[in-house]
Amino acid sequence: MLYWSIVFFVVALVAGVLGFTGIAAATADIAQILFVIFLVLFVISIIAGGFRRNRL
């Protein structure tokens, strides 16, 4: 039980450091950009798969 309390304490410290510094804002911007890129790639793959099935 002591082990898990120490693990959660360390996780809370890391989350606090990332949350209270500017690192969180920078990573959020990167995550938004990556989300849009992968969303576009997903839509393209669905459209390309639809065209491929129509040929068979």
Swiss-Prot record:
Tagged with keyword Membrane: yes
Q: Where are the transmembrane segments?
A: 6-26, 30-50
Tell me which InterPro entries the record gives. Answer: DUF1328
Keywords on record: Cell membrane, Membrane, Transmembrane, Transmembrane helix
What topology does the record note for this protein and the membrane? Multi-pass membrane protein
Keyword check for Transmembrane helix: yes
Query: Where is it localised?
Result: Cell membrane
What Pfam families does the database record attribute to this sequence? DUF1328
Instruction: Please tell me where this protein is predominantly located.
Output: membrane
| Protein family according to the UniProt entry | Belongs to the UPF0391 family.
State the protein's name.
UPF0391 membrane protein HCH_04387
Q: Which organism is it from?
A: Hahella chejuensis (strain KCTC 2396)
